[in-house]
Amino acid sequence: MSFRLSFAPPADDTLAKMRDADSFRAEMARTLGSDPYGHASTAVKSERDRREATVYGAIVLYYVSGSVLTVTVVRLVPLP
């Protein structure tokens, strides 16, 4: 099962400034897009669908909407 990736405006702005945005999107699709509860992600504040993971050198805070198969990235922090 594959999840659609969506980026909220703050995360989308950060993504637009990343050097290798296309590779980052591809890695997001490969990892969190196929298993949003995997890839060593952790629940934030005991909310199962509010998660954090490190993907392709960036910290990603996202929500999982299982009913519509969507992962929404709300914050994206590229590591130096």
Question: What does each of the following model-derived ranges do?
Answer:
Residues 1-59, 63-80:
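Basic, Lys/Arg-enriched alpha-helical interface segments
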